[in-house]
């Protein structure tokens, strides 16, 4: 697409061009756009279900096999580390591989290894079990990294003026996957044992592949990104701060995977099935609130940055209350824990949804062209930074819970989002101040030029 037809600085990334966004939303969705939505929704739902089923029962099962809390955290965390590497590679080479092929292949790998994870309980306890858990999770992460990178790029290409709205709406399906995964996994585990949850959900993902092969459109490959350097993108100051925001939010989610279920079981003596319902508070509120924040981000782009900032600050407060931190002298109660998780889900949607369009706007404002290659780079960066946090969260969470307990560990986790929220607030205030000074200087220069032009006429 040439520069005249490019929605890059304006429409892309959240509706900086209200006119373009209105024209886009006023038209009915094309058949191709509907198919893209169906494909992305099926991937979000299936992969999030397979990702989230581990929470309620795997930590306890791994303990039986001789894994420590730190090792369990590393099993959760290695997924994110290799999703990070996969996102960087696949984002860079999206143009060469092809978005549709990458999407389908990623789903196939993820579904297949999920089934394999279901037979790991047949292995002897100790190093063999732990090593195979790492191996299967690593391959699953590579598959998911491919699928999510391709999905983000396809969505941004199909909906250039409504990225936040579409991604926020699709987070409903991510949320549904996160909502359905833990209770469904816990129920199947209690009823049928370790194998059935993985085999059942792995088969669901594999059954979605023929549908996506048929309906997902193929976008014409463009030229090599060439000068569109990933490192140029990453070294932009605003992009670096946005990356820090993503890492801090992702690490908060990752922190809960190996720690929350054990804390709830020990503190409130809940069964595995009820632990899955506790996870429901976070996932359901995130799924419900995400479309609203996506719509707000596109319709009111100036509000986007403050949604991001306040979402981070609220998330920090939630993690202080999750234990709660002993300094507050508040008794830990189940209703309070669930309430905090619900608020955390809303604040997470407030922070996460505006981030991707902010990244796109930053890239386009700094000379990156509107193309599938740029979308691949931004999608890869988003996925990579999310994976950094998702890698650090479980490992640090498992380690800190062993050393200082869940209450203090959660409070320390909240400091991440507090720091990222304050950093972004300071940057946006500086950015606004700089823009105002530049505007005043331009107005002053224009006035001087007008006066100079009028002087000869007065004489």
UniProtKB/Swiss-Prot annotation:
Modified residues (Phosphoserine): 21
Gene3D superfamilies assigned to the protein according to its UniProt record, in alphabetical order: MFS general substrate transporter like domains
Catalytic activity: spermine(in) + n H(+)(out) = spermine(out) + n H(+)(in); spermidine(in) + n H(+)(out) = spermidine(out) + n H(+)(in); serotonin(in) + n H(+)(out) = serotonin(out) + n H(+)(in)
Keywords, ordered alphabetically: Acetylation, Cytoplasmic vesicle, Membrane, Phosphoprotein, Synapse, Transmembrane, Transmembrane helix, Transport
Phenotype of null mutants: Mutant mice show impaired learning ability and memory functions associated with decreased accumulation of polyamines in the brain.
GO terms under biological process: serotonin uptake; spermidine transport; spermine transport
Family: Belongs to the major facilitator superfamily.
Its biological purpose: Proton-coupled polyamine antiporter involved in the translocation of polyamines from cytosol into secretory vesicles prior to their release via exocytosis. Uses the electrochemical proton gradient generated by a V-type proton-pumping ATPase to couple the efflux of protons with the uptake of a polyamine molecule. Facilitates vesicular storage of spermine and spermidine in astrocytes with an impact on glutamatergic neuronal transmission and memory formation.
Protein name: MFS-type transporter SLC18B1
Organism of provenance: Mus musculus
